[in-house]
Amino acid sequence: MKNTNHYVVNFDDKLHTSPYSISLYRYWRQLHRQQRLFIIAIVLLCLFIYIGYRSHGAEKMKKLPEDYHRQEVAKDKQAWQRKKIEQIESNKVKVQKRIFSNPINEHQIAVRDAMRHAWKAYRTYAWGYDELQPISKTPSMWFGIGLTIVDCIDTLYIMNMTEEYNDAREWIATSFDCDANSVDKFNSHFEITIRILGGLLSIYHLTGDEIFLKRAVELGDRLLINFNTPTGLPLAEINLKRKAASGYRWTSDSALSEVGTVQLEMRDLSRISGDQKYENAADKSAAVLHNQSKKDGLVPIFISPLNGRFSGGVVSFGARGDSYYEYLLKQWVQTGKQRSVFWDDWIECIGGVRKHLWRLAYPEKLYFVGELMSLSTFSPKMDHLACFLAGNMALGWSYQRNLTYLLDMAKDLTKTCYKMYAKQPTGLSSEIAYFNTDAQLNVETITVRDNDAHNLLRPELIESLYYMYFLTNDKIYQDWGWNIFQSFEKYTRQTDGYSSINDVRNKDNVRPRDKMESFFLAETLKYLYLLFDTQNLFPYDEWVFNTEAHPLPAYKN
């Protein structure tokens, strides 16, 4: 049964009254009337002041936002961020806009007309897509961020194609968006770096337009993800949309050229943004490559970004190897010729070329650069890609002119590469050539196999002709460049744009491919235009071209 009794407190009950309250009451009763009035007045005054203070404070509190304290924390954070931004801003390299004139001779006019023809076709049938398919007149998608636009905008600017440049600039400002437009798949980190980041960096240096720097930073932050490996060497592929990095599906290795041909771009991004993180990644990856053991400066074409070890034994200045060696010299130039390790590694690899890869082909006695299989067996195969080495050696000679063998080798290799063009009925080189090294055999000096007979509108020989002409002042290199340009016009020009071709050996049926490479506009036509100028628009002590022909400044340190 529940207890229904309740405890009741009677405050009138003297048993429950505090002795203190009783004594206080007696004290109050003993005071004179005036004393009591004075105390009451004091109490009322204090009460009035208290109420006024509370109402004033409440009014002030009404004006404060609900997240007042969060804002105070945010202010502290913003102050720290402002300090960091101010530090970054102070580190930024100042860029001065360059102005280019119109073409100055018939050769340059012809090249600019070719550029306008290629651009018009892309603008008509593939605007905003990565590349044009000129036979079907349809666009093709690769990265999803306007590859042709970004890759060749500096070419448009250098050729003073104002209307076309303005269209390209507007697209980059309003439509270049890795979140919204990039394709949801893994693509080459290397290609995106040299073509798209390189293009943005270059056009920023030429114009000083901050929109290009903004886009470069947006892209660079994504590309930085790939360097997050145990060694610091970048993974081979990146999904721009997902901000995810990956190695190849078919191997855990990356190509030598891919891990060794991103340093110019990342370092330059730090110099113009003021944020050191990109250059730190470039330097760490460069250090890993420098510290590996080499065979007279030569290394295999595959390396693991997970442990930094080379695999296989193929040594090549063609596909998967070429631009690693190219960037050794160019990083030395970019850093004000202050970091001797780059020069030392480069000059050592040239010694390795002379010892292991440099051969004479018969009966025409043409020097070429072959390949090593398993680090020992020589192969008389040379990719057209390897023709870059002629200009690279000439460039190295321009800084150390006592090393005359560099210029001699550059001249010999340039001649051989031009023969790869001149000996074909179309006047265009195949992608790969084989050379006869046996003086006793009665065969052609250069042979082309069926699978290697295509031409992709590549720039490597034109690039070397550009260096050779301005370093020797020998007009033969301009003449060779003009001959090649005329062959491009005759055999690769389509009603809309230009196309790669499948067979340089058959001038009656070159079998066009439905593809116009972005590097034809970004590199081949740019180098042709520069070759035909009367002065070098990019002095070699002040500028260095990345492997996609995007000019970047050579810094003093």
Language-model regions: role of each:
Residues 2-557:
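Glycan-recognition and catalytic cores of secretory/periplasmic carbohydrate-active enzymes
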